[in-house]
């Protein structure tokens, strides 16, 4: 079995992973369940690899996954999540060959006891 179903249909799962990947790119650290974090790892690693290539085809491939979210910077300028991926995040990892994310276990969630985890960019 190549992936986790996460209790959703395929289109719901794809939408959830797109949302989580965009949130991780924008915030660089999010808290979610352990299964979602482990599944998100592969999605974000492939996006960063596309960002490292940096050509137009890679940008279009990444634009299929990353949501069109605007980010307000400290100097009151805005950029999209895709611009942050290609302009800030991908250049950090030019010397690293994969393994761009880290999953830390955070214990059970208070409401339902699900194992939560923090996923962050290394």
UniProtKB/Swiss-Prot annotation:
GO BP: translation
One Pfam family it belongs to: Ribosomal_L17
Coiled-coil region(s): none
InterPro entries xref list: Ribosomal_bL17, Ribosomal_bL17_CS, Ribosomal_bL17_sf
An annotated GO cellular component: cytosolic large ribosomal subunit
Gene3D superfamilies named among the record's database cross-references: Ribosomal protein L17
GO MF annotations, alphabetized: structural constituent of ribosome
Keywords for the protein's UniProt record, in alphabetical order: Ribonucleoprotein, Ribosomal protein
Subunit structure, interactors included: Part of the 50S ribosomal subunit. Contacts protein L32.
Family assignment from sequence similarity: Belongs to the bacterial ribosomal protein bL17 family.
Protein name from the UniProt record: Large ribosomal subunit protein bL17
Organism annotation: Staphylococcus carnosus (strain TM300)
